[in-house]
Amino acid sequence: MPRKKGRKPRDKKRKKPSTDVLSGAERHLVTRFSYGLTKDLVRDVRRRGADAWFAEQLSPGKVGDAPGQEVDGWWPSLGRSPLDLWQRTQSEVEPGWMVMEDYMRRALVRRVRSRRQVLEVMTELWENHFHVPVAADGVFTHRVAYGDAIRSRALGRFSDLLFTVVTHPAMGIYLDNATSTASRPNENLGRELLELHTVGRGLFSEADVKDSARILTGWRVDVWKTFAASYSPEDHATGPVTVMGFSDPNRSADGRELTRRYTDHLAHHPATAKRVARRLAVKFVRDEPPQALVDQLARVYLQHDTAIVPVLKALVASPVFKASRGTKVRDPAEDVVATYRALGVKLRRPATQDSAAEAILWQTDGLGGRPFSWSRPDGAPITNAAWASAGRMAASFGMHWAMAGGWWPSKDVSYRSARSWLPGKSVRFDDLVDHLAERILFRPASKQLLKACCQATGLRPGTKITKSHELVEWGMPRLLATLLDSPAHMTR
């Protein structure tokens, strides 16, 4: 009986899996702790193993990163001093919001290009936890240095990170500690330090907030003049203070060491340990992590003097982490960055406002998730519900379509040609889908994905595809976009 056209022969031998395919466990670890797989990253993991890759990533100084470091010089104003930035704004040479847009671009492009993927992921996590919106009044003068300070401590001790962010001029400007005085302590930072950054709601009193604010007085910024940061002993409120089990006579007008001891106490508080553990578990495991896992991670955190690396090691070793594949939705910025990486798109130094390294910010904006722009001090959500709406998905599909076709952005950027995706002169459509899945999603194509690709293109599994086929001539964007629209790409 003649075989129906387009049907795959039953005895057809399937090709061997590509060397670019990772095991499920490897892919799970690497996608959770990166901004998406690339050919080079996958080959590195296959050569050394995912565990060895992760171990090296936890010591970013050991990871050569010329592509990521090159980005540092692409936007010169990010290296200017606070006074210079302020004067340029006042003279209408360069407004602060433009500098902040460049800061967002640098972060996004770093995530695309950097080989230090775990460092970039952890930097974003802490920059969101200790959120200072880039649009807040005056923070542009110190916001770049604030992000850099977090990045340099993202894999260190939480106690060191906490002291750094609480005393940083950017945080002081945002939450008004920069103008807090002994006679009129401002409670904003004192409250958020307890509620958002450490122990959490419901565990502290208004008296705790008042003393927290008094402890933090003295850390000043000359706002709207030079924006110079300093410590002012005459503005420090002295006298006994008690907060969450921390007590001090607070006799000295120089409260800097007091601040250090106070933040160190909060960093080591059991409630803080559980909040840090839960945040890591929500980010890297699932939206509602088991309490047993949170408690385990909190113990590791305290046993290692608030060091983050041992907590991450314990997290990835847990059975709960291993069983959590495919449970986290990529947020808008993660989706944009992962799409650049999956398609092998090469960004170059921006020459104009239309350059891809500039336009990448508008891409995240179009999906409703530009970096560092959440309006409240609690930081952007890291749970699925916030990013899984129909509107967001439709916006992502549009972005995937534009990039699959290489239509936008199109300046100072390189896309692969449609023909370059073909594995040979002639290939069955189902084998082409497999080939693309292995090079874009780095996994074999599922039956559901093949069905979706057939529906999107109107082709049958057995259709022969050549370089002159209409799919290659004009239909490849639809096929590539179908892969990018799949759950395999939309989750991490």
Residue spans for each PLM region:
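N-terminal accessory alpha/beta regions
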Residues: R3, K39-R153
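A ubiquitous short alpha-helical element
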Residues: T89-V93, R113, P133, N177-S180, ...
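Flexible, low-complexity segments enriched for small/polar residues
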Residues: R10-K39, H269, A273-H304, K313-R492
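Short, compositionally biased low-complexity segments
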Residues: R27-R32, P95-M98, R184-N188, E234-D235, ...
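Hydrophobic/aromatic residues in well-formed alpha-helices
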Residues: V42, A50-W53, V209, L432, ...
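Alpha-helix C-capping/helix-to-loop hinge sites
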Residues: F33, R110-R111, H129-P133, L196, ...
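Active-site substrate-binding loop specific to GH73 endo-beta-N-acetylglucosaminidase modules
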Residues: P2-K15, L85-Q87, Y103-M104, V139-S355, ...
